[in-house]
Swiss-Prot record:
Region G2: start-end pairs: 41-45
Name the record gives this protein: GTPase Era
Record-linked PANTHER family: GTPASE ERA, GTPASE ERA, MITOCHONDRIAL
Organism of origin: Escherichia coli O157:H7
Domain KH type-2: 206-283
Disulfide bonds, paired cysteine numbers: none
Amino acid sequence: MSIDKSYCGFIAIVGRPNVGKSTLLNKLLGQKISITSRKAQTTRHRIVGIHTEGAYQAIYVDTPGLHMEEKRAINRLMNKAASSSIGDVELVIFVVEGTRWTPDDEMVLNKLREGKAPVILAVNKVDNVQEKADLLPHLQFLASQMNFLDIVPISAETGLNVATIAAIVRKHLPEATHHFPEDYITDRSQRFMASEIIREKLMRFLGAELPYSVTVEIERFVSNERGGYDINGLILVEREGQKKMVIGNKGAKIKTIGIEARKDMQEMFEAPVHLELWVKVKSGWADDERALRSLGYVDDL
């Protein structure tokens, strides 16, 4: 009697902030797991997205963008999370943006050169490159930087060539037992996903200054008798002025954030959600490693 083979492995998605790593992960999984926003520092946790297709299970580690800037405790911890996820995977997807190449990209590349895992280079946002003639020389420049397993021009937004990446990933999964049941898409709890959804909406609806100094704590997450969930979210900011910004004129801003977050939660949890949000000032949390640990920023380091 023959036993069917199964394949399973970990894949890190790395790159500097804002190159489209989370969008790529969401496309590879076919749904939204990692929060996406146009602001740097959106992904703060190593979210694991799981894609199971028949005998193949790919477990994606979505790293925070690696930063040159290491001043604040939160940035140091984010860099540590990104670096540690490179070390223990079968394959790395290194995401860069179009024809842009920055010192941050160079820093990520140097970390990858030290690693043992093969690296796929995903050149994202190629549909946004104005001068198409610049693309080929840039790809040749990238190819000369490291012995990449493959170089794939993609658009994570539209899905262009994302299937190519998925096929390469499948080909490099080692023979192994699946780590998760096939219907799992993430190992994060619903409570964690709720806080991520609220944080995404904060980023989407607020100015550039705020995201660096805001976090979300879920104080209550319970099933109710209506077959849904009652969720209380506490939004922590560093200054009184930021609290006013989050609440908005006569509470308009926080109301919008709550409505949009509730829609996403209901879609993700497939159940009605009653959501209440509060805003509280907790100064200096982004500089305090103890506070960060209590908020779950180093739960996997």
